[in-house]
Amino acid sequence: MDWAEKYRPMHLADILGNGSAVRQIVDWAKTWTPDSRPLLFTGKPGIGKTSAALALARDMDWEVLELNASDARTKTIIERVAGNSSTTTSLFGAGRKLIIIDEVDNLEGNADRGGARAIADILKEAKQPIVLIANDAYGVSDSIRRLCDPVPFRAIGVSTLQKRMKEICRFEDIACGEDALSAIAESSAGDMRTAVNMLFGSSTGKTSISVGDINTAQKDERATIFDLVGGVFAGAPDRELQKLSFECDEKPDSVMQWIEESIPLMHDPKRRIRAYGRISRADVYLGRTMRRQYFTLWRYATSMMTLGVASENAGAGFRTRIMPPSRWKRMSTAKKQKTVRRTLAASLAEGYSIPERQIQSEYLDLLSRFAEKDPAAFCERHNLDVDQMGIILHDKAAAAAAVKTVQQAAKERDMKVKKMAASKKAEMRKLEEQLEALRMQEPPVPETPPAAEEQPLEEPQEEKKLAPKQATLDFF
């Protein structure tokens, strides 16, 4: 059996190195209501995010519905599987189900078409606890991230990893020195799963482990874009930059945009100008790669944008933290606005029986005037959200106020229904108590003595009529 699975934490108390995250999860679970916000676990792979979610379900005795990257996550499938589960009760009664949606930062491509929008809709309507998991917080859609409470997971410390490896060696009856354990802990870079797998790979067929055995099981650590961009502006050695660019999963055009975004943060204006020249040359190589389909040029483009910009900055660093390309945010905003307008037109077209295209081209201004008279009523009638009302009213604050009014009214109605139900329940309980009291006040019914055994009645003896004796004459 795989040791990573064999020694997976079974309870939240077993999660190592992330005490603050565990406390936040426990507080959320104990006070959870249908109005509670979902949790978003973020952090690098192998530090216990999925294990914490499963342990939470086990500790709270909740059922689990898990949707991860191996599943098809189109809009239709997500709504059919997770959507139905988020609004229904447990299979075994009124218990809760924990819905775990893993790798929400990888919702892209044809396989996940419409998935982010479907998940956002589910988060708004869910009546069950939901946990979302992502390796990269920046990769999560804004429409999802703003609906969740973040729970950051940190890399596990070396001493904590070393202590856990020692426990596993004791359970498996394997001799392992402190130097070997230290090598595993340092090589795993805070990743518990990798550390356990390294220990398993090094101990296969052995009863003791040395440092030499550990060297054959080093972690295949993938560099992040933050490692690469940070190395470029921190003046990392050329060989290290080449290694980071090789290990980074980002494509060269994406890396170029990340580096370009950080160039304005350089201290020296003259160095900034020369750095832009390096980026321009890298862009030329990328263009030739696409036109000629000669992907060998990628290496020259990558070297120009990393080594070239690093040489111009000369390790001077920059003034703030690394940020994703701002153009991505603008593109995302434009795409979001387009999607909101389309969904708004669909809602209005259904309400007024007018084609969506005609709604967008001819009737939005007219409907805006209608909405301005009573925004809350318009919002409630067409079941619109804040973004859709913002397009109608051209005022985000007014849109938020209208939606808040509708939500408050709905909440008051729900509270009223709950109070009426509670009142009826109390009345029924009171009536039952009164009936029970009346039963106690009724005089006891006297017990009837047991009936004596009936004796069979003797039939009256009729007087025997004696027949007259015949006189016997004795003539003789």
Curated annotation (Swiss-Prot):
Keywords, alphabetical: ATP-binding, DNA replication, Nucleotide-binding
Organism superkingdom: Archaea
Gene3D superfamilies, per database record: 1.10.8.60, P-loop containing nucleotide triphosphate hydrolases (3.40.50.300)
Record has Nucleotide-binding as a keyword: yes
Oligomer status and interactors: Heteromultimer composed of small subunits (RfcS) and large subunits (RfcL).
UniProt function note: Part of the RFC clamp loader complex which loads the PCNA sliding clamp onto DNA.
Keyword Cell membrane in record: no
HAMAP family named in the record: RfcL
Signal peptide residues on this chain, from the entry's feature table: none
Record family assignment: Belongs to the activator 1 small subunits family. RfcL subfamily.
Region of interest called Disordered, as start-end residue ranges on this chain: 435-476
Gene Ontology MF, one: DNA clamp loader activity
Listed name of the protein: Replication factor C large subunit
Pfam families cross-referenced by the UniProt entry: AAA
